Curated annotation (Swiss-Prot):
GO terms for biological process: biotin biosynthetic process. Catalyzes the decarboxylative condensation of pimeloyl-[acyl-carrier protein] and L-alanine to produce 8-amino-7-oxononanoate (AON), [acyl-carrier protein], and carbon dioxide. It comes from Proteus mirabilis (strain HI4320). SUPFAM superfamilies: PLP-dependent transferases. This is 8-amino-7-oxononanoate synthase. Its cofactor is pyridoxal 5'-phosphate. Pyridoxal 5'-phosphate binds at G109, Y110, S180, H208, T234. It comes from the Bacteria. Substrate binds at R21, H134, T351. The gene is bioF. One of its GO terms (molecular function) is 8-amino-7-oxononanoate synthase activity. Signal peptide: none annotated.
Length: 387
């Protein structure tokens, strides 16, 4: 089979189905609203900017100051010319904030997850991962020479059984703090205890917990009262920017600096971005009011949709999935909301398990109660018309 025939075959399998992915050009977004290239304006219920920090004037001004001081790029890997005082200060601030020896900056959460697993695991080792872990974690685990075992979602007993069965040299337990498609929290305290009993390390990707959960927004692990050996803090959600950091002890940080290809051979984030992240961290630490308001929005939304004829997952976070199941019906609902001025994107397999197509509704502090009330009214209207 030629390359062209292969590509055509695979594309035709998906074309004209709800599974066909297409990027849409956004002309402007301020968190609450987004405007497409055609000029249409929508209330945005699909973004991850949970605290609205991407629009915060202090953060915007910090990026501008950083660009004026350092330029718009780092110019190289952190091991060559790309590690500036701005990077160093941000790493130290993150480590102090979260109670670790070190923080290492990566260009994205995907890169951080891939880098940790690719660097640490060898053939005699085992990765014990939650079945619903993010694609970045699962891809890294599959590509790793280590054995991969998956435990039932958020099941501490299933994790314990897997660890009992493994005879690996070293074991790494992998989970998310808040799961990106379900919005539920991992039982981190139980998982940490089980991991310690088996001398396994625990790795927590807290992309959707950092900034919005725990004291000062310190995240899922702080809220659960644990300190995993490896904590991934990403900056594309509550921080409102992009990039990530791996929090760990001194020896582990030195190991990554020596052996992590994702760290060594990647151009580091722009120094101006590090300056902006420092400003975002200051906002996050002080924004208890924003976190409290977000919880109020979550409660209001859940109460309003509780009687809908769909499955509302038991999430108490900003991620509120409505499980529709049927892919065509899910797309019809998303299209209906878009016609009414609401941007709520449908999520399909393989991003989520089979037969669990859903609307992944995300709430942010940029929303008003009136926005959510109208969304609730539209959802009820759709199901009343399409019983």
């Amino acid at each position: 089979m030629s390359w062209q025939n292969y590509l055509d075959k695979r594309l035709n399998e998906r074309r004209n189905t709800p599974l066909w992915r297409k990027r849409q050009v956004i002309q402007h977004s301020n968190g609450r609203y987004l405007t497409t290239l055609s000029g249409d304006k929508y209330v945005n219920f699909s973004g991850n900017d949970y605290l609205g920090i991407s629009q915060h004037p202090d953060v915007i001004q910090a990026w501008q100051r950083g660009a004026n001081e350092y330029g718009v790029g780092s110019g190289g890997s952190g091991h060559i010319t790309g590690f500036t005082q701005a990077h160093q200060q941000l790493e130290q601030q993150l480590a102090d904030w979260l109670g670790y020896d070190h923080a290492l900056l990566f260009s994205s959460g995907y890169s951080a997850n891939q880098g940790v697993i690719a660097t640490l695991l060898e053939k005699e080792d085992a990765i014990i991962a939650d079945k619903l872990c993010h694609a970045s974690l699962m891809e890294a685990a599959i590509l790793s020479p280590a054995s991969l075992w998956r435990f039932l979602h958020n099941s501490a007993p299933s994790l314990s059984q897997r660890l009992h069965k493994t005879s690996a040299n070293k074991s790494l337990v992998v989970t998310e703090g808040v799961f990106s498609m379900d919005g539920d929290k991992a039982p981190l305290a139980a998982m940490a205890e089980i991991s310690q009993q088996h001398q396994a390390w625990l790795m927590v990707d807290d992309a959707h917990g950092i900034g919005v959960l725990g004291k000062e927004g310190k995240g899922s692990c702080h809220e659960a009262g644990i300190k995993p050996e490896l904590l991934i803090a990403t900056f594309g959600k509550a921080f409102g920017i992009s990039g990530a950091a791996v929090l760990c002890n001194k020896a582990t940080a030195e190991f990554f600096e020596q052996y992590s290809r994702h760290l060594i051979y990647s151009t580091s984030m722009p120094p101006a971005q590090a300056v902006a992240l420092h400003a975002a961290l200051k906002v996050i630490k002080q924004d208890d009011e924003g976190r409290e308001y977000l919880q109020q929005l979550i409660s209001f939304f859940r109460q309003g949709v509780s009687s809908l004829p769909v499955t509302l997952l038991p999430s108490q976070t900003a991620i509120q999935p409505l499980i529709i199941g049927d892919e065509l019906r899910c797309q019809q609902l998303s299209d209906y909301l878009q016609r009414e001025g609401f941007w709520v994107k449908a999520i399909f397999p393989p991003t989520v398990p089979p037969h669990s197509a859903r609307l992944r509704i995300t709430l942010t502090t940029r929303h008003q109660i009136s926005d959510i009330a109208m969304l609730i009214e539209l959802l009820h209207g759709f199901f009343n018309q399409n019983r």
